[in-house]
């Protein structure tokens, strides 16, 4: 299933939220109706919270079914909310704060449950991320950009990436993340940073409300969501 949605009128929903195969996170100000749509489409429990008093959950955090990394300025009460949510839903994963120079982890990491590509800016943390996410981690910029997370979205089934991604980079992503499907594309009326506009897992995708019909079709193809 794939639907278009705004979060309080904002189309760049991937900056504000994230999803794995086990759970989703959304900003504290997200309306209950929006949260319910996320739950239905992604078929996972979803929690609304802030990280570091910020609503930029998808930009600051990164997760798969084995672990989640948080910026070092995450507040204790936010960590408690997250921990309680995971326990309530019997989700046993590693939760780790990472003290890096650039803490926009969601913008810098593209991963699923099979592999992970990180920005070259985070190369020193490759082994740390392998231990947390329990997958192979490769440091590589994509489309000559360090923001591999905001310029791509990946699930265990497929991926959509920045339109300037080269053929060689497509093959690398496909190989590292062990994917059958991958496509180049845009979202939200031509935005190349597709990860900033899409929240997805293998069950479905919620895409920014400004996304056009042709973009939606390419997203469905890349994420292997066409029935």
Curated annotation (Swiss-Prot):
Gene3D superfamilies (alphabetical): L-arginine/glycine Amidinotransferase, Chain A
Superkingdom of origin organism: Archaea
Keywords recorded for this protein, A-Z: Initiation factor, Protein biosynthesis
Record's keyword annotation contains Protein biosynthesis: yes
InterPro entries: eIF6
Matches recorded under Pfam families: eIF-6
GO biological process, one term: cytosolic ribosome assembly
A Gene Ontology molecular function term of the record: translation initiation factor activity
Coiled coil: none
Primary role: Binds to the 50S ribosomal subunit and prevents its association with the 30S ribosomal subunit to form the 70S initiation complex.
Family named by the database record: Belongs to the eIF-6 family.
UniProt name for this protein: Translation initiation factor 6
Organism encoding this protein: Methanococcus aeolicus (strain ATCC BAA-1280 / DSM 17508 / OCM 812 / Nankai-3)
Gene that this polypeptide is encoded by: eif6
């Amino acid at each position: 299933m794939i639907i278009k949605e705004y979060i309080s009128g904002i189309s760049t929903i991937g900056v504000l939220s994230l999803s794995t195969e086990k759970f989703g996170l959304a900003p504290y100000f997200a309306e209950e109706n929006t949260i319910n749509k996320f739950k239905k489409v992604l078929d996972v429990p979803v929690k609304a919270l802030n990280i570091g008093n910020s609503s930029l959950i998808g930009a600051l955090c990164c997760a798969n079914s084995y672990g989640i990394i948080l910026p070092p300025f995450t507040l204790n009460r936010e960590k408690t909310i997250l921990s309680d949510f995971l326990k309530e839903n019997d989700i046993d994963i590693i939760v780790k704060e990472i003290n890096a120079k650039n803490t926009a982890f969601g913008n810098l990491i593209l991963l699923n449950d099979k592999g992970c590509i990180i920005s070259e800016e985070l190369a020193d943390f490759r082994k740390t991320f392998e231990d947390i996410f329990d997958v192979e981690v490769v440091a590589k910029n994509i489309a000559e950009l360090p923001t591999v997370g905001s310029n791509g979205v990946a699930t265990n089934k497929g991926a959509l990436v920045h339109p300037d991604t080269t053929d060689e980079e497509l093959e690398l992503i496909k190989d590292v993340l062990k994917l059958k499907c991958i496509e180049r594309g845009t979202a939200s009326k031509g935005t190349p940073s597709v990860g900033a506009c899409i929240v997805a897992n293998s069950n479905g995708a919620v895409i920014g409300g400004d996304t056009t019909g042709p973009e939606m079709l390419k997203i469905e193809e890349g994420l292997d969501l066409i029935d």
